[in-house]
Amino acid sequence: MISFVDNVLVKFRRVFINILTVLFLMLITLSFFYVMGSLFESDKVETEDQVLYLEPNGVILDKAITRNEPFEEFEIFGNSTNQIELESFLKVIKNAGTDDDLKAIYVNVDDLSAYYTSALKIADALYEARENGKEIIAFTSGLGTTGYLMASQATEIILEKDSYESVLPFGFSRVRQYQKDFFENIKVDMNVYAAGDFKSGPEGYTRNDMSETDKLAWLEFVTPVWEKYKSKMEAGRGFESGKIQYVGDNYHLLSAENGGNDNETALAIGLVDKLMSKQELRNYMIEKYGSKEEYERPEGISGREYLSTLKDRHVSNKKKRVQEKNKIAIIHVEGAIV
């Protein structure tokens, strides 16, 4: 009888221990999947009810340039420049313009450099986003012609109140040194051999001023660009045709009417909509779009984060393009030919 009870207890203990082991393993497995799920979930970028903050810092390029210099990692002077691919930047703006999840787009292009053609494309994309009903708030501490071209497509432009710079979109300039007298004074005889017209490259060594052919070449190049800039800035701000040119030609008079204060002048003539300090801008953004207490400004995502949400869509579109005919292949080449 005792041996029978012992056998029952032994079997019961084994079953009980096995059940506990199974439950323990199940708990470990569920905990593992929960942790992994939390990690993946935290990597997911939420766009609903967010503000897209576009604050690019760098230079816009058609294709980022790679460098393979052996001592690049030991650079101590910080000469490397952040490169932003134009296609990616345009993709962010165009998709954001039709994304109903986003509350608005905040733009600051103070630290962005772009060539004329790239700036015109960015301006077109911002204008299209605004026409699609997306509110765009542009903030700046001061802009020149190309920067203002892009910012002028925003729904609202806010200039930093106490900024030492201002908004001065009044054309292009080209500066060059002419050193003929210098070389004569130091008794250096410069001999330049050139054939044909429009050979202005070496004029810095042979003249003290710009030649008529060099003036003509520069004006032929820059005038169409300036005309396009003016029309887009005027369309973006709702100005009548010719206002940007008038403001540029008469800015000294307009500034004098506002006590020589460039920021007040920009506000008075409509180049910007508001003057605010950064703290006032923060309060204004929170009032318009709301914010949780722990955030310094309305909840939002960066352009890089938003671009990551478009990658899957880009891959599927790329597969479709592979199947299409009559495609044009673009090959970017960099480096020296040896």
What do these predicted ranges mean?
Residues I2-S255, I286-V338:
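Small-residue-centered hinge/linker elements
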Residues G147, D262-N263:
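Short, hydrophobic alpha-helical packing/hinge segments within bilobed ligand-binding/sensory domains
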Residues I157-L159, V272-K278:
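Short acidic-hydrophobic, aromatic-tinged amphipathic segments that line or gate anion-handling sites
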Residues K278-Q279, M285:
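A non-catalytic alpha/beta surface segment that caps or lines the substrate-entry region
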